[in-house]
Amino acid sequence: MNIRPLHDRIVVRRIEEETKTAGGILLPGSAQEKPSQGEVLATGNGQIRDNGETRALDVKAGDKVLFGQYAGQTVKVDGEELLIMKESDVLGVLEG
């Protein structure tokens, strides 16, 4: 099943971070924070302005993004946990 976000929303898959500390200690699942990085899987058509025009989104599918710990709404699609969030929830795009 594919999911197509509407307007200024995007679908993001979290990128799992290291489960080890710098000192080599393995962290149990309960001690790990939710990842705040992800890959954009799909984007909506854009933000609808007050004058009716649509502004294209700055992020695109394939971008690696940073977002706040509590950003977006978690959904399960085909057993995979994804996030749907507004583009404004994105703090930045990782480049390089």
From Swiss-Prot:
Location(s) in or outside the cell: Cytoplasm
Molecular function in Gene Ontology: ATP binding; metal ion binding; protein folding chaperone; protein-folding chaperone binding; unfolded protein binding
InterPro entries (alphabetical): Chaperonin_GroES, Chaperonin_GroES_sf, Chaprnonin_Cpn10_CS, GroES-like_sf
UniProt record, GO biological process: chaperone cofactor-dependent protein refolding
Pfam families (alphabetical): Cpn10 (PF00166)
Region (Disordered): 26-48
Record Gene3D superfamilies: GroES chaperonin (2.30.33.40)
Residue stretches in coiled coil: none
Alphabetical keyword list: Chaperone, Cytoplasm
NCBIfam families registered for this protein in UniProt: PRK00364.1-2 (NF001527), PRK00364.1-5 (NF001529), PRK00364.2-2 (NF001531), PRK00364.2-4 (NF001533)
HAMAP family in UniProt: CH10
Described purpose of this protein according to its UniProt entry: Together with the chaperonin GroEL, plays an essential role in assisting protein folding. The GroEL-GroES system forms a nano-cage that allows encapsulation of the non-native substrate proteins and provides a physical environment optimized to promote and accelerate protein folding. GroES binds to the apical surface of the GroEL ring, thereby capping the opening of the GroEL channel.
Family: Belongs to the GroES chaperonin family.
The protein, known as: Co-chaperonin GroES
Organism name: Psychrobacter cryohalolentis (strain ATCC BAA-1226 / DSM 17306 / VKM B-2378 / K5)
